[in-house]
Amino acid sequence: MPNTLTVDLGHRSYPIVFAADVRNNVRDQVAELTTAGRKVAVFTDEQVASAQVGALEAMFGSSPRLAFAPGESAKSLASFGRAMDFLAAQKVDRRGVVFAFGGGVIGDLAGFIAASWLRGIDFYQVPTTLLAMVDSSVGGKTGINIPAGKNLVGAFHQPRGVFIGTDFLRTLPAREFAAGMAEVIKYGLLGDAALLELLERAPLSFVSPELAGVIRQCCALKAAFVQADERELAPEGGRALLNLGHTFGHAIEQVTGYGVYLHGEAVAIGMCAAARLSAKLGHLGGADVARVDAVVAAHRLPVKLRTPLVLMDLLAAMARDKKVRAGMPRFVVLRKLGEAVTQDDVPAELAAECFREVGAS
């Protein structure tokens, strides 16, 4: 039997359904929508479509679907335009509904498609990666990348529901699973000491008995941040704390063209850089930084860049980050392991030192 967690946003509240196998739950939702005369359109990627042929048929039947090439490159204006043409050809009207079936890239892209088509139609998330399950499928952030930066074009558009089925992780490559663990580690560093200690005792894997509970726990933490500060407008802290490691990580992704590091891998390096920044600001000690490095490495994630990147390129990319305020990058720093704050008056030379310490040249 599935269990449910509600993201409480008043009249825009929605359920997150958890089960090992959510195919019947999704199928029932699709049947309810189509019986009511609402057209369903499905967006996925070619890799998921190949690995989950049976699930696609079981959940969506004959509903039209469009598959994009896998990877971050799909979050593009070209993909967005292709999706618009697809929805037009399928004659999807304002009562139409989009389903995102895939990882974080598909969720971000399909959500933005739904936010934009006819000025906004309903959509549902059916995440198939650990990263999407614990983070990107919840909270309504949607968007695409442009050459100037990651997620610079997008919208806040909450889903009508999220279906999290851990059985989808059976076909997830080990590298993708590890990338998702970066976001799990993030929650432990932000404020869940028990979660951090669990991860330090033994790395989580697909067969870990704690996995389903950890996924639900991460979603509950994410929901709490979203409920308190949905549009990331709090002057300090708030939802922006979820960007721990992302200011450094997004710069790494942009400089490498989104094809070298998975998002979670870049965030992992970014969290290690953020720990070093926190130490330079007088918050963490060397033992704390070593703990961050150790839990990241234990989950088969990079602590440092695999090959050096040009420091000035990274700093330039950071300056274009969407979180910049008054020309200054905004960082999430750790006062201690389990407590974070936002800070936007970080001297550029400190950020540069942190990049060097994780492998920039």
From Swiss-Prot:
Pathway(s) annotated for this protein in UniProt: Metabolic intermediate biosynthesis; chorismate biosynthesis; chorismate from D-erythrose 4-phosphate and phosphoenolpyruvate: step 2/7
Main location: cytoplasm
GO CC, any one term: cytoplasm
Binding-site positions, Zn(2+): 183, 246, 263
Keywords in alphabetical order: Amino-acid biosynthesis, Aromatic amino acid biosynthesis, Cobalt, Cytoplasm, Lyase, Metal-binding, NAD, Nucleotide-binding, Zinc
Comment on bound cofactor: Binds 1 divalent metal cation per subunit. Can use either Co(2+) or Zn(2+).
Record's catalysed reaction(s): 7-phospho-2-dehydro-3-deoxy-D-arabino-heptonate = 3-dehydroquinate + phosphate
UniProt GO MF annotations: 3-dehydroquinate synthase activity; metal ion binding; nucleotide binding
Gene3D superfamilies the record matches: 3.40.50.1970, Dehydroquinate synthase-like - alpha domain (1.20.1090.10)
Function (record text): Catalyzes the conversion of 3-deoxy-D-arabino-heptulosonate 7-phosphate (DAHP) to dehydroquinate (DHQ).
The protein's name: 3-dehydroquinate synthase
